[in-house]
Amino acid sequence: GLWRLQGPGGVVMAMFYVDDGLVAARTAAEADALVALVASIFEIRSMGEPRDMLGISITRDRTARTITISQPDKAKALAEAAGVAGEQRRVPMSPEVFAGLRAARDGEVMADRDVFRSQLGMALHMQQCTRPDCSVAVHALAPYASAPSQVHHDALLDVITYIGSTADLGITYGRKALAVETYCDANFASCLDTRRSITGWGVMMYGGAVSWSSKKQPTTATSTMEAEYQACGAVAREVISMIKAFDELALLCADFPILGPLTIFCDNKAALTLCKERKEGQRAKHIDIIHHFARDHVASGELQFVY
């Protein structure tokens, strides 16, 4: 759970997960006061400066004023368990492998399903916490967890090799201005099994990623414009929900401003036009209303899409 308290110097945040917790405050005195308050009710132990939380390493550089989160130990353990420790790889998945992924056919050599699922689950956890660079590759393999072929397992081992050889990579948040930077894109009809497109988006704050996704679209797009428009709707839902959460936590203040419409970058001009205008031509009349979410929030002034 996440709790917010109003201290004399500003907002104090406390996050707890089972028996682990973090406290964030403007001053050490305010953080210590909250810890003392909790200690008066429950038996707790203060560990001082946070170094690790739920397997996520937290590195703070006070000189550079940055915080980096990473999972080097988990990355190395995953590579060791998969038998690829020490091997090197520069990308999680090659474009050729990604473009050729499809369900196993009769006669193909199948992989051990339990082993595949176990390794995939660990890779999914890492990409969800600190490794957005692996999101596309890991989610491309997830649909084959019920019947993985050896081709799928080989591709997964490539991803794990990359994770292990880049174990120290993480996300760094620094002194860069708050400015929320959001990007979205779509890979048209890239799934060979369903011919559905894949939506990808990322939200950046203080120079680091705070939210990201690579996911197959819920409906089949018949054009690149429609695929990109669906991506716009998906990222709009995420951004709006984040802003509402910030508002509920009273984070939208002088020290945490979000002024004017949030900008989302998209590289398809036809999709941008559809986001801004309520005129649908013959090529857009069939698009499901769920994907018009973005357009409504552009009209309200909360969002703006930029090429």
Feature annotation, model-predicted:
Residues G1-Y307:
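Long, low-complexity, charge-biased intrinsically disordered regions
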